[in-house]
Amino acid sequence: MGRLGVTEILMILAVVLLLFGGKKIPELMKGLGSGLSEFKKAAKGDEVPDSKKDETKE
């Protein structure tokens, strides 16, 4: 009952396409991808704190 089949996934994609339109979906996916990328960087600890960024610019 908790698993999605191919038919259910296709129906969900069709509804998303109807709601957002073909032009808006690439923008949404780009935003999602950049958000996931930032989250992964933060989880790794690769980001330098703001105070250290200011010191390196000077």
From Swiss-Prot:
GO terms for molecular function: protein transmembrane transporter activity. One of its GO terms (biological process) is protein transport by the Tat complex. The chain crosses the membrane at residues 4-21. Signal peptide: none annotated. Keywords: Cell inner membrane, Cell membrane, Membrane, Protein transport, Translocation, Transmembrane, Transmembrane helix, Transport. Belongs to the TatA/E family. This is Sec-independent protein translocase protein TatA. It comes from Flavobacterium psychrophilum (strain ATCC 49511 / DSM 21280 / CIP 103535 / JIP02/86). The gene is tatA.
